[in-house]
Amino acid sequence: MRRLLTLTTLLAGVPLAAPVCAEQVFSFQRAAGQLPKTVVPVSYGINISTDIDNLKLTGQETIQVDVRTPTEDVTLNQAGLHLAGAVLDNGVKATITQDDAAETATLHFPAKVSKGAHTLVITYSGPILKTPNGIYVDDYTAPSGETKRMLVTQFEVADARRMFPGWDEPAFKATFQLNVTLPKEAVAVSNMPVTQSTPEGTSQKRVSFATTPRMSTYLLALVAGDMKSVQGQADGTPLAVYAPSGLEEQGEYALHASEKILPYYNNYFGVKYPLPQMDMVAIPGNYQAGAMENWGLLTYIDNVLLFDPPNSTPRTRELIYEVVAHEMAHQWSGDLVTMGWWDNIWLNEGFASWM
């Protein structure tokens, strides 16, 4: 409150060239975007199988949708995926047209889909990338000297469409329940806790995560690999910092920082952090985003999350605290409350930096 009062006082003395106009109250129908708003996702059930050696994924998703205007066509985003089939409700099949330049797919049904709740099942496949966007692999040198491979996602601004077809615009919020098949030795983390892990054949396992709150597609996240963690808690919320095995102890400083920051934000915003956990992950090297505020699974390039006392400088300690505080602020400003379109992302970033 004191910071806001100070800022208001300072601005009161600044001459303005034109009247300041507040934006209108958010309206989903008026929100900017490229997709039609005739069909809106309510929940996604996403099942993906990963082949990280051959860089391929296959998927099937079940999307509960709300048809707001009867239509024969459902248009959603995809980028680099091949949609093999789409079925509505009791087996009504769609004809699929993909526009790779527009990064969309249009599902055409033989008759208008009626207004109300429907179930859409889509089967698809696609690549796992080596570039740090969408779903990709990060090859790095472990402390042991071995070359290791980590599976990582980075969806901001508009790359969730590289892992699953969906309404990949920030205004289209929905819940997500993620299931992923991956190497059995990998530790997998996502926005929510693991609910089940079962063997798949001799070399893989299927990991299921709890359903997220309503959120934008760009905030969904998955990281899997040879990782270990240090753990703590604050205000009743379990906290953890994950790092490549052998480096996990270097996450202690970031963990202690988060234990101080979380109670402060809970009090400052007057809304307690709503997810059942908060995990932070150090991505070794191939992570151009620097840091990302995925709701409940904050990801960082390793040199802004890990602190090695014999080798790190005091400035590194300051940087870690600053970046952790910034990404944690986004759990409210950006994740809980989200801009309707990307032209207001400056407000997300500005507010998190100001905090």
Curated annotation (Swiss-Prot):
<dbReference type="GO" id="GO:0005615">
    <property type="term" value="C:extracellular space"/>
</dbReference>
<protein>
    <recommendedName>
        <fullName>Aminopeptidase N</fullName>
        <ecNumber>3.4.11.2</ecNumber>
    </recommendedName>
</protein>
<comment type="function">
    <text>Aminopeptidase N is involved in the degradation of intracellular peptides generated by protein breakdown during normal growth as well as in response to nutrient starvation.</text>
</comment>
<comment type="similarity">
    <text>Belongs to the peptidase M1 family.</text>
</comment>
<dbReference type="InterPro" id="IPR042097">
    <property type="entry name" value="Aminopeptidase_N-like_N_sf"/>
</dbReference>
<feature type="binding site">
    <location>
        <position position="156"/>
    </location>
    <ligand>
        <name>substrate</name>
    </ligand>
</feature>
<keyword id="KW-0645">Protease</keyword>
<dbReference type="InterPro" id="IPR027268">
    <property type="entry name" value="Peptidase_M4/M1_CTD_sf"/>
</dbReference>
<keyword id="KW-0482">Metalloprotease</keyword>
<feature type="binding site">
    <location>
        <position position="349"/>
    </location>
    <ligand>
        <name>substrate</name>
    </ligand>
</feature>
<dbReference type="GO" id="GO:0006508">
    <property type="term" value="P:proteolysis"/>
</dbReference>
<keyword id="KW-0479">Metal-binding</keyword>
<keyword id="KW-0031">Aminopeptidase</keyword>
<feature type="binding site">
    <location>
        <position position="349"/>
    </location>
    <ligand>
        <name>Zn(2+)</name>
    </ligand>
</feature>
<dbReference type="GO" id="GO:0005737">
    <property type="term" value="C:cytoplasm"/>
</dbReference>
<feature type="active site" description="Proton acceptor">
    <location>
        <position position="327"/>
    </location>
</feature>
<dbReference type="GO" id="GO:0042277">
    <property type="term" value="F:peptide binding"/>
</dbReference>
<feature type="binding site">
    <location>
        <begin position="290"/>
        <end position="294"/>
    </location>
    <ligand>
        <name>substrate</name>
    </ligand>
</feature>
<dbReference type="GO" id="GO:0070006">
    <property type="term" value="F:metalloaminopeptidase activity"/>
</dbReference>
<keyword id="KW-0963">Cytoplasm</keyword>
<dbReference type="GO" id="GO:0008270">
    <property type="term" value="F:zinc ion binding"/>
</dbReference>
<dbReference type="InterPro" id="IPR001930">
    <property type="entry name" value="Peptidase_M1"/>
</dbReference>
<dbReference type="InterPro" id="IPR050344">
    <property type="entry name" value="Peptidase_M1_aminopeptidases"/>
</dbReference>
<dbReference type="Pfam" id="PF01433">
    <property type="entry name" value="Peptidase_M1"/>
</dbReference>
<dbReference type="GO" id="GO:0016020">
    <property type="term" value="C:membrane"/>
</dbReference>
<dbReference type="InterPro" id="IPR014782">
    <property type="entry name" value="Peptidase_M1_dom"/>
</dbReference>
<feature type="binding site">
    <location>
        <position position="326"/>
    </location>
    <ligand>
        <name>Zn(2+)</name>
    </ligand>
</feature>
<dbReference type="Pfam" id="PF17900">
    <property type="entry name" value="Peptidase_M1_N"/>
</dbReference>
<feature type="binding site">
    <location>
        <position position="330"/>
    </location>
    <ligand>
        <name>Zn(2+)</name>
    </ligand>
</feature>
<keyword id="KW-0862">Zinc</keyword>
<keyword id="KW-0378">Hydrolase</keyword>
<dbReference type="InterPro" id="IPR045357">
    <property type="entry name" value="Aminopeptidase_N-like_N"/>
</dbReference>
<dbReference type="GO" id="GO:0043171">
    <property type="term" value="P:peptide catabolic process"/>
</dbReference>
<dbReference type="InterPro" id="IPR034016">
    <property type="entry name" value="M1_APN-typ"/>
</dbReference>
<dbReference type="GO" id="GO:0016285">
    <property type="term" value="F:alanyl aminopeptidase activity"/>
</dbReference>
